[in-house]
């Protein structure tokens, strides 16, 4: 998916519609 411009070292993405995969990068669901 597309990058969300957010990292998720805690395993949580705060950007709506994004998931922490592959860690530690948030990508669009």
UniProtKB/Swiss-Prot annotation:
Keywords: Disulfide bond, Knottin, Plant defense. Pfam families: Cyclotide (PF03784). This is a cyclic peptide. Belongs to the cyclotide family. Moebius subfamily. This is Chassatide C1. It comes from Chassalia chartacea (Chassalia curviflora). The keyword rRNA-binding does not apply. The presence of a 'disulfide through disulfide knot' structurally defines this protein as a knottin. Probably participates in a plant defense mechanism. GO terms for biological process: defense response. There is a cross-link at residues 1-29 (Cyclopeptide (Gly-Asn)). Disulfide bonds join 4-18, 8-20, 13-26. Expressed in leaf, fruit, pedical and stem but not in root (at protein level).
């Amino acid at each position: 998916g597309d990058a969300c411009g957010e990292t998720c070292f805690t395993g949580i993405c705060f950007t709506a519609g994004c998931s922490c995969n592959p860690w530690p990068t948030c990508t669009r669901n």
